[in-house]
């Protein structure tokens, strides 16, 4: 969905294959393009499942493939499209961390986490799902401030003006997220806020889940290692700055991360040493402006070029080098020769 503006601006036609779980926005965009006068065939929508995907990956007229989704599917897209000679950018999963230093403004950090962890019910690739607290004092204060905020989240259909969090995308995904919460409890994490049994009046059969908050999460737990893609925030306690950076850098994903601190030296060291494609300082979600490139490192991205910015233009264009000579305009005596080994 993010790619078509750059692709079309660079002179390409574009085929959008949206998720079968969320097909409507793509069709609405196509209708708006039609009303705006975009010529037929420039922006196209194909709905379908893996059969449609495989057809695009192998079709000889498709020159480039962009994808955003889970890491296993991103790997499949990258390998299959590359095998068929396509240029590929495949954005995969994420486990985005927000590190909180002892000197941070905790109220700002809490506000940031409420939006970054629970906005869109945590169903976005840049959601913050891990809060890394430097020191037990920071963690204790953060939990104390977060708990009532998570408990009081206004959960209702997204069409309601007062809604702060809506439902999950499918009943199957709701069951999956609930299962992860159960795993976290079984593995020894402290479930501070349990939203598994949340019910919205009048929507008892809806795919609603309350916000969930864990403390004392460790790096070997499933809720830390896996991308849950739901309203579940894990608090991990570390003893110092270096331990926090090491924790983040050792994760298999390297999509985005951010630090909350008042210390410029800590911020500079963090931004230079952390192994992630998008890094923020005192911002909830480190999404860059569109004129910069968007994308992660490690198992969060497959392919050499990111989305948007200069990388986006490079991806949707091809380099052409032109060399010319105009003999009638060359001064007398000029010589052209190719260097040889003789």
Positions of predicted regions on the chain:
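Rossmann-like NAD(P) dinucleotide-binding subdomain of oxidoreductase/dehydrogenase enzymes
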Residues: 1-111, 238, 303
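Structural detector of well-ordered beta-strand residues that form the stable sheet scaffold
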Residues: 8, 15, 44, 89, ...
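Gly/Ser/Thr-rich beta-alpha loop segments that engage phosphate groups in nucleotides
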Residues: 13, 21, 50, 71-72, ...
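ALDH superfamily catalytic-core signature
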Residues: 37, 64, 72-218, 247, ...
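Conserved C-terminal structural/oligomerization subdomain of aldehyde/semialdehyde dehydrogenase
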Residues: 38, 62, 99, 154, ...
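Conserved residues at the C-terminal ends of beta-strands
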Residues: 49, 68, 116, 261, ...
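CheY-like receiver
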Residues: 55-56, 112, 247, 270
């Amino acid at each position: 969905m993010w790619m078509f503006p750059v692709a079309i601006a660079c002179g390409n036609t574009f085929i959008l294959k949206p998720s079968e779980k969320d097909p409507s926005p793509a069709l609405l965009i196509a209708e708006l393009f039609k009303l705006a006068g975009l010529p037929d065939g420039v922006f196209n929508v194909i709905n379908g499942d893996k059969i449609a995907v495989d057809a695009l990956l192998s079709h000889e007229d498709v020159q480039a493939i962009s994808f955003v989704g889970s890491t296993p599917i991103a790997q499949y897209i990258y390998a299959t499209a590359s095998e068929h000679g396509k240029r590929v950018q495949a954005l995969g999963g994420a486990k985005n961390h927000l590190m909180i230093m002892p000197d941070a403004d905790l109220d700002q950090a809490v506000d940031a986490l409420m939006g970054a962890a629970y906005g869109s019910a945590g169903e976005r690739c840049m959601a913050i799902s891990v809060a890394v607290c430097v020191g037990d004092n920071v963690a204790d204060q953060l939990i104390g401030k977060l708990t009532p905020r998570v408990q009081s989240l206004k959960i209702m259909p997204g069409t309601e003006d007062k809604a702060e969090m809506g439902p999950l995308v499918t009943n199957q995904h709701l069951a999956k997220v609930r299962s992860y919460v159960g795993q976290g409890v079984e593995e020894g994490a402290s479930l501070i806020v349990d939203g598994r049994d949340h019910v919205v009046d009048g929507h008892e059969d809806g795919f609603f889940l309350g916000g969930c908050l864990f403390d004392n999460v460790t790096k070997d737990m499933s809720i830390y290692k896996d991308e849950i893609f739901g309203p579940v925030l894990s608090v991990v306690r570390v003893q110092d700055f270096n331990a926090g950076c090491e924790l983040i850098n050792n994760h298999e994903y390297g999509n985005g991360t951010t630090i909350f601190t008042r210390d410029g030296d800590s911020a500079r060291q963090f931004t230079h040493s952390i192994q992630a494609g998008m890094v923020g300082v005192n911002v909830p979600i480190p999404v860059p402006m569109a004129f910069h490139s968007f994308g992660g490192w490690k198992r969060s991205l497959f392919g050499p070029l990111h989305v948007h910015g200069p990388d986006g233009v490079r991806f949707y264009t091809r380099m052409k080098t032109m060399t010319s000579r105009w003999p009638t305009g060359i001064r007398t005596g000029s010589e052209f020769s190719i260097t040889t080994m003789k």
